[in-house]
Regions:
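Conserved coil-to-alpha-helix start sites within the AMP-binding
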Residues: 1, 20-24
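Phosphate-binding glycine-rich loop
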Residues: 1-13
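A short helix->loop->beta-strand "cap" motif at the edges of active sites that frequently abuts
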Residues: 12, 33, 85-89, 116-117
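Active-site phosphate-binding strand-loop segment of PLP-dependent enzymes
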Residues: 40-103, 107
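Conserved core segment of the aminotransferase class I/II
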Residues: 112-189, 196-200
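Conserved glycine-rich beta-strand-loop-beta hairpin in the small C-terminal domain of fold type I
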Residues: 173, 188-202, 208-221
Length: 221
């Protein structure tokens, strides 16, 4: 799928945070796209700073992989404002949304005003339901964003995708069962408890630690 880049002009200016999920960068290189990097710095609490230059496509990941920090509503509103002012598209990786526990962190970017005009969100069943290697994910492309993007995506999918494999489909469907939801919630709490235990241990020995609250992983210095 190359993370949706096939939807956009080859000359589009792409912004990717550093560090981030490496597939973003690999996908852009596979399509011979030019990429700019936005450093995520400790002094900014690993929050990407809003750029002063114009970019057409911005990759944001929340909870961030690999740092583990999730972005608040107040913070994301600044990115949406930037996208509106610069006619940009935010590609919003939200595959760990079920791990979010903080009340000021949205479970979806679409909780925020004007986000449907600026953002394409992608999610995954496999992270929440513990079958990451099997793979089952989906995009949300609002009609408000641009009437042509949804149409082009459907044409692209019809011609280049034969469908999710049957095992993954059954796993995704089963995740909506009442019994499955109980197991999924138990597992998510288990993973978050493990992350908290690791975080507390590192903090005890005076390491600096981020993440582990709205994500099942931590970043240690």
């Amino acid at each position: 799928e190359l993370l949706g880049l096939e939807l956009f002009d080859i000359n589009a200016k792409i912004l990717i945070t550093n560090p981030t999920y490496p597939v973003y960068l690999n996908g852009t290189y596979a399509l011979s796209r030019e990429v700019s990097f936005l450093p995520i710095k400790e002094e900014d609490n690993f929050l990407p700073q809003i750029p002063t230059k114009k970019y057409d496509i911005i990759y944001l990941c929340s909870p961030n992989n690999p740092i583990g920090i999730a972005y608040t509503k107040e913070y994301l509103e600044k990115w949406i404002e930037y996208a509106i002012n610069n006619n940009s598209i935010i590609l919003y990786d939200n595959v760990y949304h079920d791990y979010i526990t903080s009340p000021d962190v949205p479970k979806s970017i679409y909780e925020l005003p004007n986000s449907k005009k600026t953002s394409i969100e992608f999610r995954s069943f496999s992270k929440s339901s513990s079958f990451t290697g099997v793979r089952c994910s989906y995009y949300i492309i609002p009609n408000d964003i641009d009437k042509d993007i949804n149409h082009i995506w459907k044409l692209r999918t019809l011609n280049r995708f034969n469908g999710t494999d049957y095992i993954a489909q059954k796993g995704a469907l089963a995740s909506y069962d009442k019994e499955s939801k109980e197991i999924i919630n138990y597992n998510i709490k288990y993973y978050l408890d493990n992350a908290k235990s690791l975080k507390d241990t590192f903090l005890k020995y005076n390491f600096k630690v981020w993440g582990g609250i709205d994500s099942p992983f931590i970043w240690v210095k």
